[in-house]
Amino acid sequence: VIDQETKHYYQAGFLFIPFGIYTAKKVTKKISSYLPKGVEHLNIRVDLIKPEENKVIISDDRELAYDILIVASGCRIVPAEIEGMDGEGWRKDIFDFYTVEGSTALAEKLEGWKGGNLVVHVAEMPVKCPVAPLEFAFLADWYLAKKGKRAGTKLTYVTPLAEVFTKKRTSEILGPLMAQKNIEVVTDFAIEAVDSGNKVIKAYDGKEVPYDLLVTIPTNMGDEVFERSGMGDELNFIPTEKHTLKAKNHDNVFVIGDASDLPSSKAGSVAHAQAEVLTENILRHIEGKELLPDFDGHSNCFIESGYGKGFLIDFNYDVEPVEGTFPIPGIGPLKLLKESRINHLGKLAMNWLYWNLIIKGIKIPFMTSKMNLKGKKL
């Protein structure tokens, strides 16, 4: 395993740090604590990949040969892609919560918040965990009300989408909930620049949204090494076969998680579902067998809605989120597309499940890599 980091993060927990629900310590562990015995961890940066030569060049100029390369490099925020975003206002009145540093700095900012225009903004799609910006808006509404500061805050949600979410049925539920919580929604906002001097975000069509505090999800991109290596698309994501997880242009390269260009969500649940398919296909590749087209884009996402409640959605490439029960068909105990206390508790339970079961590859009962259509109102 080549990884320039020594720490691993439960990234879904970053959402809770700005509101004092989690600390950075709760979402951070040493990588070395989770690698199986016999697995070597090279704590170093990858500078270049030569897929035609089956070689990886690392930052000390060593060349490492491979028979199979598994890319699990994730994606990253790149605020520099938006004019003015990472300038004078960065981490002063412009913040992200997609990094542990950003979410920790934002916690301090929110603690001293006096009121004004709080704008939650998505720069462009795709982004990691596409429900997270919505969750932040809902939690900000709850948090500011708890602090007695909601009445003095105008809360605005700005998205490049035509609706609040990528899935229509979910938008039909969450859009009205935004209105109910007095969160203004600005859709179809294609950002051109951030004017941090005047505290305004500007769209290409001339629309402007003023802010006192901008919580943004900047452009998400794959690792720069794929641009240098000629392996990525315009956002440095690797073109990947959507059902087998093999890189489209390289027969012995496989991709898991956020590093691919797949039309599935960039989310932990997706990577978890992919892992089973990927493991089987790597074994089949070694044995010279045809790869199985078994990944169906399965994703399930908890959506925090504030005040100790949440939603849960379950979908794949072809099936939109629908009502039903999860994970046990007909029993639940979780309800799909319904706001409930138990869905919120399920979201919180994922932290323990992640560190103790999921990351260790321990199978969770009733959790399947493919979407189970039983118990759903299709």
Annotate the PLM regions.
Residues 77, 81, 87-114, 198, ...:
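FAD-site-proximal beta/loop scaffold in flavoenzymes
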Residues 142, 271-297, 303:
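Internal hydrophobic alpha-helix adjacent to the cofactor/substrate pocket in enzyme cavities
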Residues 39-135, 139-148, 215:
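FAD-binding core/adjacent interface of flavoenzyme oxidoreductases
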Residues 236-254, 305-325:
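FAD-binding beta-loop-beta segment adjacent to the flavin cofactor pocket
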Residues 117, 152-155, 252:
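Residues at the starts of beta-strands that form the adenosine-phosphate
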Residues 39-56, 64, 145-240, 290:
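A Rossmann-like FAD-binding core segment of flavoenzymes
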Residues 1-40, 124-168:
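Beta1-alpha1 glycine-rich phosphate/pyrophosphate-binding loop at the start
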Residues 312-378:
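C-terminal auxiliary extensions adjacent to catalytic cores
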